Curated annotation (Swiss-Prot):
Deamidated glutamine PTM sites in chain numbering: 592
Keywords: Cell membrane, Chemotaxis, Coiled coil, Membrane, Methylation, Transducer, Transmembrane, Transmembrane helix
The protein's name in its UniProt record: Probable methyl-accepting chemotaxis protein BT9727_0469
Keyword Cell membrane applies: yes
UniProt-annotated location(s): Cell membrane
Residue ranges of every copy of the HAMP domain listed in the record: 301-353
UniProt family annotation: Belongs to the methyl-accepting chemotaxis (MCP) protein family.
Organism: Bacillus thuringiensis subsp. konkukian (strain 97-27)
Residue span(s) of domain Cache: 150-221
Sequence ranges assigned to domain Methyl-accepting transducer in this UniProt record: 372-622
Length: 658
């Protein structure tokens, strides 16, 4: 169905659809690809930012814990079984208090012996029956002898701070040292980390509870769907929904504590970050479509306009107007088609003109042939009649000779008939003379008409020479315009340089100067193109001058031929006059022969035998004359048919305007 519509559509519609598809589809693909690429880039950038922030927070945690692990190792080397003796307890207490004063980030530092002794700074009264060996921190450190143990975060019962205990068994296994590290600084640091606009960092312990979160409280249980992905691997990223919004999360696991440090950000921020690029892309596509649409309009117009002109001219030629031509403005395929069309029209014009001329000549020749054949037919018929009469006379003369009485009268009658035939020939000669005079007048009119044509050709030659001079003046004016355009371009360039030197104050002037320079360049280019056209016109004028000179020469030759024809008709007329005089003389002689016929009576007997022989020959001649008359009639009929065909051909050619 679509293919059928395209076949019925105009060339303009087909070109428009093709250009629109070529323009819009790549623009949409490029725009959509750019938008998706921007989203991907922003997503990677934000994820990278989240990973960097998570790593920074992980390093902060490691730094805090590492320093306390070093301190714990130091004290476990310092304290031993002797340190828990009664005389050394105060010394241990002093060292712990000194350390506590130097490290405000800790809540307490303490040590417990395997015998149940417990020393702490700051010093507080422990409940009765308190035995450090029964505490989790002591058991875990003793269980992992030689390693530093870090407990899960918990809330201090005395201060309410969130703390972790860093514990290590003494080297001699006489006791365990513990440092309660306040992690409020770590929590506060995590709250200060921003990912994107509304993203944040959260910390979860190894028991899947919240340590730090902007909206959840420490100790809260995390959601099961998040927990499942978060604790499935050491590091990674995934997406989940929170309060109906898509969130991206990237996380790592702190190797010392087992905590999960996660960077969480809304997915809509990626879209919002990519939207400006999307809108800019839409704007660029819109502008491109507008500019492309304008260009497409002019391109299609440059194709369709000459084709429409070609269709109109073709229709005129099909209707018989062979003078129609089209103006060619380009050298592309359409321009070549236009030139070929003009060449075809010129060739057809030349062919029809030649056929018309030939048809006229054939018609004239056929008419002349018809007239000549008619005259020949009449003359032949007269000769046949005369021969028949001579034959009859010969028979009569033969009979009269045989009878011997009526011979002289028969001869006299025959001579009288010859005189009558001579009179008829004289009449035909007078008719021929009249036709020759008419032909002479027609030739004289032709000579006059050829003279008028010669004068018109001479006048056209003068006009074309004047047009050549005018085209040369136009060429000189175009050179001046091109020189002015070059000077304007140079001035615009100088103005742009001065405007650039003026800085921001000359920026507007620089734009104007640049536009002037562009206009100057366009003027120069246009004047150059016009110059080319003027040169082509001058070349065509020279060709026309040469052709007009050739036409003048041909017209002059025609005048010479026409004058010669006129002279020939004059000679024919003179010859006809001479013939008429001779025929008149022949008539007079025939009359004289009638008078003298009686004088030849004595000779009739001698020629009687000869007359009998001639009678048979006359019969043969009469038969041949009749056959010749039939042939002349056939030629005459063919000439008439040829004349009719020539007239029909002229009528057909007359439909064409040449």
């Amino acid at each position: 169905m679509l293919q059928g519509k395209l076949r019925r559509s105009s060339l303009k519609a087909k070109l428009l659809v093709s250009f629109v598809i070529v323009l819009i589809l790549p623009s949409i693909v490029i725009g959509w690809t750019s938008y998706q690429q921007a989203k991907t880039n922003f997503n990677e950038t934000i994820l990278q930012s989240a990973e960097d922030n998570v790593k920074i927070l992980n390093n902060v945690i490691n730094k805090e814990i590492d320093s306390k692990k070093v301190d714990a190792v130091y004290f476990t080397k310092l304290f031993n079984g002797v340190s828990y003796g009664t005389d050394q307890l105060q010394n241990v207490q002093n060292k712990l208090e000194e350390y506590n004063k130097l490290h405000p980030e800790i809540e307490a530092i303490y040590t417990g012996s395997s015998t149940g002794q417990f020393i702490q700074s700051p010093s507080i009264q422990m409940p009765d029956g308190y035995n450090p060996t029964e505490r989790d921190w002591y058991k875990e450190a003793a269980k992992k002898s030689g390693e530093v143990v870090i407990t899960a975060p918990y809330k201090s019962s005395t201060t309410g701070n969130i703390v972790i205990t860093i514990a290590k068994q003494n080297e001699d296994k006489s006791g365990v040292l513990g440092i309660d590290l306040i992690i409020n600084d770590i929590v506060n640091t995590s709250k200060m980390v921003n990912i994107g606009k509304t993203g944040f960092v959260a910390i979860f312990d190894q028991s899947k509870h919240v340590i730090a979160h902007p909206t959840m409280k420490p100790g809260d249980k995390i959601e099961e769907k998040v927990e499942k992905e978060l604790y499935k691997q050491e590091t990674g990223d995934f997406k989940f929904k929170l309060d109906g919004d898509d969130r991206n999360i990237t996380f790592i696991t702190n190797k010392q504590t087992g905590w999960k440090i996660a960077g969480i950000m809304p997915s809509k921020e990626i879209i919002e970050a990519a939207n400006p690029i999307f809108y800019k892309t839409l704007t660029v596509i819109g502008i491109s479509l507008i500019i492309g649409g304008v260009l497409i309009y002019f391109i299609i117009a440059s194709i369709i306009s000459p084709l429409k002109q070609l269709v109109i001219s073709s229709k005129k030629i099909s209707e018989g107007d062979l003078t129609e031509t089209i103006t060619v403005h380009s050298k592309d395929e359409i321009g070549q088609l236009g030139e070929s069309f003009n060449e075809m029209a010129a060739s057809l014009h030349h062919v029809i003109s030649n056929i018309n001329t030939s048809a006229s000549h054939v018609a004239a020749s056929s008419e002349e042939l018809t007239a000549s054949m008619k005259q020949t037919s009449e003359a032949t018929e007269q000769i046949t009649q005369a021969i028949e009469q001579v034959s009859s006379g010969a028979e009569i003369q033969t009979k009269e000779v045989e009878e011997g009485a009526t011979l002289l009268e028969g001869v006299t009658e025959g001579i009288q008939r010859v005189a009558d035939s001579s009179s008829l020939v004289s009449t035909a000669s007078m008719y021929t003379k009249k036709k020759a005079e008419d032909g002479g007048k027609l030739v004289e009119q032709t000579v006059n008409q050829m003279q008028l044509i010669h004068e018109s050709v001479s006048q056209s030659d003068k006009v074309i020479v004047l047009l050549d001079d005018k085209s040369k003046q136009i060429g000189a004016i175009l050179e001046v315009i091109q020189h002015i355009a070059e000077q304007t371009n140079l001035l615009a360039l100088n103005a742009a340089i001065e405007a650039a030197r003026a800085g921001e104050q000359g920026r507007g002037f620089a734009i104007v100067a640049d536009e002037v320079r562009k206009l100057a360049e366009q003027s120069g280019q246009s004047s150059t193109e016009i110059g080319k056209l003027v040169k082509e016109i001058q070349f065509d004028i020279k060709e026309t001058v040469s052709s007009m000179k050739q036409v003048g020469t041909e017209v002059q030759s025609g005048l010479v031929v026409a004058n010669e024809t006129k002279q020939s008709f004059a000679e024919i007329l003179k010859s006809t006059d001479d013939t008429v005089v001779q025929i008149d003389n022949m008539v007079d002689v025939a009359k004289q022969m009638t008078v003298d016929a009686r004088q030849v009576s004595a000779s009739i007997n001698e020629i009687a035998a000869t007359i009998e022989e001639n009678a048979a020959s006359v019969q043969n001649i009469a038969g041949s004359s009749e056959e010749q008359l039939a042939s002349v009639d056939e030629i005459n009929a063919a000439a008439v048919h040829l004349s009719q065909m020539a007239e029909e051909l002229q009528e057909m050619i007359g439909k064409f305007k040449v």
